[in-house]
A protein has these predicted regions:
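Catalytic-core regions of glycoside hydrolase
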Residues: 85, 89, 97-101, 113, ...
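Flexible mid-to-C-terminal extensions adjoining Fe-S/redox cofactors in radical SAM and related proteins
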Residues: 204-258
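Active-site beta-loop-alpha junctions enriched in small/polar residues
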Residues: 36-38, 72-76, 102-104, 131-139
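A C-terminal junction/extension of Radical SAM enzymes
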Residues: 117-210, 251-258
Length: 258
């Protein structure tokens, strides 16, 4: 539901349904719903209901797929949206609902802190992420910001490109289902990423390359494109991968041919 903000572009039901089917076809064990702010989508609850019903009838050899929702918590200011969230929290296929708000990065940080306990009390599946920046990565949009906290976090990041695991594991697996299980074992639950247009990315940003579209391309073609993909080298973290002397990363470069 990328760019799902008051002034942004919303994912259509056709794209959402196709994205869900792509995830099921790929053997995904976790479906992460994010944005923009997903609760700003005019059909937020309807889409989540659709997802919950669809996943209720899916079984894989590695377990039943669940879904999570990532939000900034702005819905807590609105009674109608809060009631919608309360209903969504009751869905049996929901693994967790995370509200993220970091000091210096989110305008609503003070508001979330004020009502933090009330928000958490809505459900045992409600989580608040507000302890620093776990991993701020330059995915294109972040590199254009003037926010000093974000710029500092990016410059000090010693991690590698966000697409690395996907690009690497896909070259060592035969099927998309095998890949999905491998990524789940590596705690990579948010890739590949489908944006609001239906484009599929190996990272979490629409600024990153697309390897197909869930509406216009058949899923096998998308998988083959993902399998051929290598880091494009556009974001600043590519330097960490390119220059690292770590044996595992040297091997990773050899496998990917970079």
């Amino acid at each position: 539901m990328q760019e799902s903000t008051e002034n942004g572009c919303h994912m259509s039901e056709q794209v959402f349904a196709k994205a869900v089917e792509f995830g099921i076809w790929s053997g995904a064990l976790t479906f992460n719903i994010s944005g923009g702010e997903p609760t700003e989508h005019p059909n937020f609850e309807e889409f989540i209901n659709l997802l919950n019903v669809r996943l209720s009838n899916v079984y894989t050899e590695f377990g039943r797929p669940l879904f999570t929702i990532e939000s900034n918590g702005e819905w807590a200011r609105d009674v109608r949206k809060t009631n919608a969230v309360k209903r969504v929290l009751k869905h049996k296929m929901l693994a967790g609902f995370q509200v993220s708000s970091f000091k210096g990065l989110y305008k609503n940080y003070d508001f979330i802190q004020k009502y933090k306990n009330k928000i958490k009390a809505l459900s045992p599946r409600m989580f608040i992420a507000d302890e620093g920046i776990i991993s701020m990565q330059d995915l294109g949009r972040a590199s254009k910001t003037d926010n000093p906290a974000i710029r500092k976090a990016i410059s000090e990041n010693r991690h590698n490109v966000s697409c690395l695991n996907g690009c690497l594991v896909s070259k060592q697996t035969k099927t998309m289902k095998e890949l999905s299980f491998g990524l789940a074992k590596a705690n990579q639950h948010c890739k590949p990423f489908v944006d609001w247009k239906g484009n599929v990315h190996w990272s979490e940003s629409i600024c990153c390359p697309s390897y197909g579209n869930v509406v216009t391309d058949d899923f096998e073609t998308i998988w083959q494109n993902l399998k051929k993909a290598v880091p494009c080298g556009t974001c600043s973290l590519f330097k960490n991968l390119k220059e690292s002397k770590d044996e595992k990363l040297v091997l990773a470069r050899m496998i990917m041919g970079i």
